[in-house]
């Protein structure tokens, strides 16, 4: 997709991208806080209890109270911990999600019929870039586990590594399948090309494989073997407390938000609205991004609901599911996607 930009706007592009980047960081942080609240309230509804309701209207200020609690807790460090690894691990975990945000559009606006994606930058290989930098968080997890000098933390990190190695392969194959059918590795082009023909209907098998692999990549139930409380206390994050724990916890929720955006952009049509024609500036700014956010919230609710619907798998079951079930399905979907792409002339 090529957008013709007037010459007088060209010098302002770096400033606009910087402002958009700062705004997106704030929006994603607020979205992660909203995801925490949504999970607690939805989990409470599933379990027929009230959930957060004491601090603020509908418990909305409970997150502020939790943040104050974490800020005021003492920052403890194990006696035999490696200070360099232990203190800097959060940089990799937060850096991973922020690097994803650079190429991930969180919406689009239509001005005079021209589409302007809300992204810091557009890359021709943005899908591969996002998948690559999302894997950097494993370095932070290993730094925490090894630097903590704790057997439970290290075992949790080993489980995380075994899971990620298995599920990154089918995840990558499904991404390539979508790109092959669309004819582009640019996530903006993939979202725009769907129109009314969403990829979830053209590649239902690919959507299933991608979603399951994404759940494993995020470490959500039933794939949270790296921090299963009954076996490993808190897994790789056992020795973290205070804001160190808070930042690691927060990075997981930001990752979940960005993963939901990926599902919506790759398979649910992105910001495309059925029957919507961007001939009005006001609706062209509000409607597409709002529709994408609705899809993201829906995906979040599915992820949260599965936590209470599916039991945790054993680590051997997780590995078998990846290599023996999802990988063949991903390859089958790739053949289907290539054939469909040739038929559609991608």
From Swiss-Prot:
Q: Source species, please?
A: Methanosarcina barkeri (strain Fusaro / DSM 804)
Q: Does the keyword Cell membrane apply?
A: yes
Keyword Disulfide bond listed: no
Which PANTHER family does the record associate with it? NADH DEHYDROGENASE SUBUNIT 1, NADH-UBIQUINONE OXIDOREDUCTASE CHAIN 1
Q: Which Pfam families match?
A: NADHdh (PF00146)
- Quote the subcellular location field of this record: Cell membrane
GO terms classed as biological process: aerobic respiration; methanogenesis; methanol metabolic process
- Quote the catalytic activity from the record: methanophenazine + reduced coenzyme F420-(gamma-L-Glu)(n) = dihydromethanophenazine + oxidized coenzyme F420-(gamma-L-Glu)(n) + H(+)
GO function term, MF aspect, one: NADH dehydrogenase activity
Top enzyme category: oxidoreductase
Keywords, comma-separated and alphabetical: Cell membrane, Electron transport, Membrane, Methanogenesis, Methanol utilization, Oxidoreductase, Transmembrane, Transmembrane helix, Transport
HAMAP family hit by this protein: NDH1_NuoH
Membrane topology designation:
Multi-pass membrane protein
Looking up NCBIfam families in the UniProt record yields: F420_dehyd_FpoH
Q: Which GO terms describe its cellular component?
A: plasma membrane
Residues annotated as transmembrane? 18-38, 91-111, 125-145, 170-190, 196-216, 257-277, 284-304, 326-346
What Enzyme Commission number(s) appear in the record?
Answer: 1.5.98.3
* Function statement: Component of the F(420)H(2) dehydrogenase (FPO complex) which is part of the energy-conserving F(420)H(2):heterodisulfide oxidoreductase system. The membrane-bound electron transfer system of the complex plays an important role in the metabolism of methylotrophic methanogens when the organisms grow on methanol or methylamines. Catalyzes the oxidation of methanophenazine to dihydromethanophenazine. It shuttles electrons from F(420)H(2), via FAD and iron-sulfur (Fe-S) centers, to methanophenazine (an electron carrier in the membrane).
Q: Please state what the protein is called.
A: F(420)H(2) dehydrogenase subunit H
Q: Which residues form a coiled coil?
A: none
Annotated family: Belongs to the complex I subunit 1 family.
Q: How does it assemble?
A: The FPO complex is composed of at least 13 different subunits. FpoA, FpoH, FpoJ, FpoK, FpoL, FpoM and FpoN proteins constitute the membrane sector of the complex.
């Amino acid at each position: 997709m090529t957008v013709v930009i007037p010459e007088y706007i060209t010098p302002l592009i770096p400033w606009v991208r910087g402002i958009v980047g700062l705004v997106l960081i704030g929006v994603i942080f607020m979205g992660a806080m909203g995801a925490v609240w949504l999970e607690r309230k939805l989990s409470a509804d599933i379990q027929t209890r009230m959930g957060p309701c004491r601090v603020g209207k509908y418990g909305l200020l409970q997150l502020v109270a939790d943040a104050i609690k974490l800020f005021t807790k003492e920052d403890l460090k194990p006696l035999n911990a490696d200070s360099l690894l232990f203190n800097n691990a959060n940089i990799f975990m937060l850096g991973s999600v922020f690097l994803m945000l650079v190429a991930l559009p969180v919406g689009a606006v239509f001005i005079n019929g021209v589409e302007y994606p809300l992204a810091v930058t557009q890359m021709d290989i943005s899908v591969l870039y996002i998948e690559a930098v999302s894997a950097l968080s494993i370095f932070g997890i290993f730094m925490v586990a090894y630097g903590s000098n704790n057997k439970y933390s290290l075992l949790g990190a080993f489980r995380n590594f075994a899971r990620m190695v298995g599920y990154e392969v089918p995840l990558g194959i499904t991404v390539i399948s979508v790109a092959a059918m669309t004819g582009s590795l640019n996530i903006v082009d993939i979202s725009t090309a769907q129109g009314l023909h969403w990829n979830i209907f053209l590649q239902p098998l690919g959507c299933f494989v991608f979603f399951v692999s994404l759940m494993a990549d995020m470490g959500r139930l039933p794939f949270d073997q790296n921090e299963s409380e009954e076996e490993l206390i808190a897994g790789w994050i056992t020795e973290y407390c205070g804001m160190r724990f808070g930042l690691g916890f927060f990075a997981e929720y930001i990752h979940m938000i960005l993963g939901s955006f990926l599902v919506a952009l790759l398979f649910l049509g992105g910001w495309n609205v059925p029957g919507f024609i961007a001939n009005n500036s006001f609706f062209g700014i509000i409607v597409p991004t709002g529709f994408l956010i609705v899809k993201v919230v829906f995906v979040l609710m599915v992820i949260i609901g599965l936590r209470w619907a599916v039991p945790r798998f054993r680590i051997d079951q997780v590995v078998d599911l990846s290599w023996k079930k999802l990988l063949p399905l991903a390859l089958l979907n790739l053949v289907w996607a290539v054939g469909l792409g040739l038929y559609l002339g991608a």
